[in-house]
């Protein structure tokens, strides 16, 4: 029975299945033919191998493609696996770091974070925590009411960074004194909160050789703030009001670190002092140092330390200078020198204008200023007169020459106006130089030009005339030149004879010129392009297919006859191949 079943399976026609080169061919064959053992599969593969004679039932043998070995070398599916492994590793490391992060309560217990108190003494819990330099927001989008920066000084005094409302900034009324003690929070719901950028790091300034605990910066919870606008945009809002504007100071990376009581003093844009009466007296009496916004921007570019955002926040720094801050004074001096060097190229011409009385080109106007107030530590401040004298070394009356626009066209307009002003300055300086040119009388008075009367001028001219006539009289005449054989005497007849002689000589040369045939005989002219022959011809219609251009039957017969004669007589052909020559029909 078993033998008969095997014969039956052998007699069945072999199905056309996948080729032998494919990997899962054994499983498919086993499923399709209901084979159970491996021996039967191998036997079937041997029947379907190359040694099998292809008959009616055997499928055609497939050839392996030339790209079959490419998978051994080029395996791009493994690259994705490597990338996914890297992503898994980084995600696992991030999850591990997040799980190891401590909560806010633990940081408060350890003393890293400090709880904030209201004015009444109630505990005010923070809602936002600074993580990795950005404020973490947990669903609520309330703006920060106030931001306080507490810094430790030598005597424990603080420098409070307060926020002014935008309504006061727009009206131009800014309170000059501090509204609250440093360290306290003002939570007044009447005014509009100000937007502030989140700082990159919490900053604690080191104290000179003291182990006092460093207070951390505390920030209320806030959404991601918009990028700050340039400082020059506030100028048009507060240009008419005479009140000084308190610009903000954002905490950031301090390099180099400055003590909190140091007054940042920058050189002004203008190179000369412009005393303006009551405004300058008011500033000197209040011990205020003004800093222009362009200088603040230059200071920010140079040190990269203090980020001034143009929201409606204010800075109030105690200007009492500790005795051990010589290094920072030197830094401020170098800052002032660099600012003066940068601004001197475009503003050194302005001094000449003011000296010559052309003061109409400068638009003197009041500008927004940073007010640095003096409150505490008054015993370290020197006397009023000496303080004013020392501040005059670094602070001067700043006035802007150009108006700034509200939009992003501020820089372009300032550049345009600066270039226009420089152009006008160049023209005016040229006019001034021409107007300052000394007259002839001044030159004569300075003995640069000799003093001459009219008679002396006439005498000098007569002397020059006599010299010229003497030189012309010394010139040789034509007779003298003829005697020296330099100038030959000529008559008209002689000149005409000379011209005739030249004509004869030329005609003789042209008549003796050889013709083309003579040159061909002498083999001087080799190719036809060496000479040109002219022939007279009548104009005719050069278009073809005319009745007189068509060949008639007689013309064609004559042409055939001429060709046959040429082939029979003039074409030299071997006698053995003469029978192969084709002649045209007559």
Swiss-Prot record:
Binds actin monomers (G actin) and plays a role in the reorganization of the actin cytoskeleton and in formation of actin stress fibers. The keyword Ribonucleoprotein does not apply. Residues 397-413 have a biased composition (Acidic residues). Belongs to the phosphatase and actin regulator family. This is Phosphatase and actin regulator 1. RPEL repeats lie at residues 92-117, 428-453, 466-491, 504-529. It is found in: Cytoplasm; Synapse; Nucleus. One of its GO terms (molecular function) is actin binding. Residues 373-414 are annotated as: Disordered. GO terms for biological process: actin cytoskeleton organization; actomyosin structure organization; cell motility; stress fiber assembly. One of its GO terms (cellular component) is nucleus. Interacts (via RPEL repeats) with ACTA1. Gene3D superfamilies: 6.10.140.1750, 6.10.140.2130.
């Amino acid at each position: 029975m078993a033998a008969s079943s095997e014969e039956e399976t052998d007699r069945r026609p072999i199905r056309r299945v996948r080729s032998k080169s494919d990997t899962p061919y054994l499983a498919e064959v086993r499923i399709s033919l209901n084979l159970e053992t491996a021996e039967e599969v191998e036997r079937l593969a041997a029947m379907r191998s190359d040694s099998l004679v292809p008959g009616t039932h055997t499928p055609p043998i497939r050839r392996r493609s030339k790209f079959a070995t490419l998978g051994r070398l080029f395996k791009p599916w493994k690259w994705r696996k490597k990338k996914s492994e890297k992503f898994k590793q980084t995600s696992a490391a991030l999850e591990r770091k997040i799980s190891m992060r401590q909560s806010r309560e633990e940081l408060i217990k350890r003393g890293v974070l400090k709880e904030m108190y209201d004015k009444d003494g109630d505990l005010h819990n923070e809602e936002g925590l600074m993580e990795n330099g950005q404020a973490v927001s947990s669903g609520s989008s309330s703006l920060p009411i106030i931001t306080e920066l507490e810094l430790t000084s030598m005597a424990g005094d603080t420098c409070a960074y307060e926020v002014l409302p935008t309504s006061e900034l727009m009206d131009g009324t800014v309170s000059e004194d501090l509204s609250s003690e440093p360290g306290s929070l003002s939570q007044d719901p009447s005014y509009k909160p100000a937007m502030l950028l989140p700082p990159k790091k919490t900053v604690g300034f080191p104290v000179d050789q003291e182990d006092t605990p460093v207070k951390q910066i505390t920030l209320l919870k806030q959404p991601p703030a918009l990028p700050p606008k340039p400082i020059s945009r506030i100028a048009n809002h507060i240009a008419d009001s005479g009140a000084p504007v308190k610009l903000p100071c954002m905490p950031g990376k301090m390099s180099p670190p400055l003590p909190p009581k140091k007054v940042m003093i920058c050189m002004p844009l203008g190179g000369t002092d412009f005393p303006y009466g009551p405004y300058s007296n008011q500033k000197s009496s209040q011990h205020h140092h003004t800093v222009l916004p362009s200088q603040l921007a230059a200071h920010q570019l140079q040190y990269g330390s203090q980020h001034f955002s143009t929201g409606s926040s204010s800075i109030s720094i105690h200007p009492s200078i500790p005795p051990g801050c010589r290094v920072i004074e030197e830094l401020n001096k170098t800052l002032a020198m660099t600012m003066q060097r940068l601004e001197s190229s475009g503003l050194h011409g302005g001094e000449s204008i003011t000296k010559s009385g052309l003061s109409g080109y400068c638009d003197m106007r009041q500008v927004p200023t940073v007010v640095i107030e003096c409150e505490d530590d008054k015993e370290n401040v020197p006397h009023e007169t000496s303080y004013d004298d020392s501040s005059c070394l670094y602070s001067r009356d700043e006035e802007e020459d150009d108006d700034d626009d509200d939009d992003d066209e501020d820089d372009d307009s300032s550049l345009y106006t600066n270039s226009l002003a420089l152009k006008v300055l160049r023209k005016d300086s040229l006019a001034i130089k021409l107007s300052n040119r000394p007259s002839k009388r001044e030159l004569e008075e300075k003995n640069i030009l000799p003093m001459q009367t009219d008679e002396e001028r006439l005498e000098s001219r007569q002397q020059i005339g006599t010299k010229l006539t003497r030189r012309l009289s010394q010139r040789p005449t034509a007779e003298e030149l003829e005697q020296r054989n330099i100038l030959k005497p000529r008559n008209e007849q002689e000149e005409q004879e000379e011209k005739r002689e030249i004509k004869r000589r030329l005609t003789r040369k042209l008549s003796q010129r050889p013709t083309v045939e003579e040159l061909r005989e002498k083999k001087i002219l080799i190719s036809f392009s060496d000479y040109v022959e002219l022939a007279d011809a009548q104009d005719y219609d050069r278009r073809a297919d005319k009745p007189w251009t068509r060949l008639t039957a007689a013309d064609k017969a004559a042409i055939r006859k001429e060709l046959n004669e040429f082939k029979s007589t003039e074409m030299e052909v071997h006698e053995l191949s003469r029978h192969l020559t084709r002649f045209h029909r007559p």
